[in-house]
Amino acid sequence: MRKGEVGFVLVVVFLLLGFSSASTDDKYQRWRKSMFSPYSTATSSLLINRAGSSIVFPIHGNVYPTGYYNVTLFVGQPAKPYFLDLDTGSDLTWLQCDAPCVQCTPAPHPLYRPSNDLVICKDPICESLHAPGEHKCENPEQCDYEVGYADGGSSLGVLVKDVFAFNYTNGVRLNPRLALGCGYDQLPGTSYHPLDGILGLGRGKSSILSQLHDQNLVRNVIGHCLSGRGGGFLFFGDDLYDSSRVVWTSMSSDYTKHYSPGVAELFFGGKSSGLKNLLTIFDSGSSYTYLNSQAYQALTSMIKKELTGKSLKEAVDDQTLSLCWKGRRPFKSIRDVKKYFKTLALSFINGRTKTLYELTPEAYLIISSKGNVCLGILNGTEVGLQDLNLIGDISMQDRMVIFDNDKQMIGWIQANCDRLPKSRTMYM
């Protein structure tokens, strides 16, 4: 999903069009990369099993006011930089592409010039992006795609393979050939941001992580650390954290399209809201957190009740987010207001055990440009999420969030996200 207030709930429909024939509102932003360089003599099977075999990417951006996080990937020969919106809620990575481009949005770099290495229609990566029974190969020599996002944006294109440039944390260079989308017809959504494309980090076979894992180059583990001060880092691999210090919960076996811990119970100030069975997903493609209409109304009622008699008054003139409050003077940081707000928590049930994911005020509030405090939790039902509940970037800040696809676990640990990791000891 991607980015801002509505992460990408991705609808993938492959149209099998001929490659040559294919002739913003910040309040509701969309929820929306030869194997080794000549300098390396190590084999992939050795690298994946030793320390330093993770790949780390610096992250740029913030929840507010930028409204999204992005990373830089280097693609092609010679390698060229592209800024991509990182999205754990969708699978396919794509770049705006000169194929030629029918419709492309303004971007920070020149359009990607695709290689001549087309992904054929019967390739497993192409098949993975079709619903069962809907994979029809009208043109068997290529894999055409159309992806649509909940903010109304879309990308139409064709899958190609090209060389990506990565570095392991031990310094070894890595140049795998991976599939990506060459998007030659883009329709911007309501949350359009000037980027070169989307970095799909979901659980599907087409994701960059899955492709690297299938080539035995990294563990099937992804994580990110988003700083509340802006920036952070993204990583592939499992040697940057001490697993014994991480809080873990199981991935749902009933909801396999996204990184979901299953259903949750909502707590406010240590007390149950009475709302249970809230189907929840983690999604870096959403700047903000979403609750279904019933949970959202219950939460806002509890917050308003808690603020009764206090010096905060609702700021109806501040349209930064759906609900804002003002004080006697403008606020400069969450520290100025956190005494008025209680900790929220989602309790995930795994068999007989329960795991709490706590949200301190820093994890669900922002200070607007007007100096008011605004609730960074929104009504997901109103923006098309129906009953789905979504943990967005605001609620994942200043902690390492880990998605271990090998063990089917989701984990988190408080962390300093301002520094790129060199070893797991930095999180002790």
Residue ranges and their predicted role:
Residues 48-75, 251-270:
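Charged, flexible boundary elements
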Residues 55, 64-178, 182-186, 191, ...:
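Signature of the N-terminal lobe/flap region of pepsin-like aspartyl proteases
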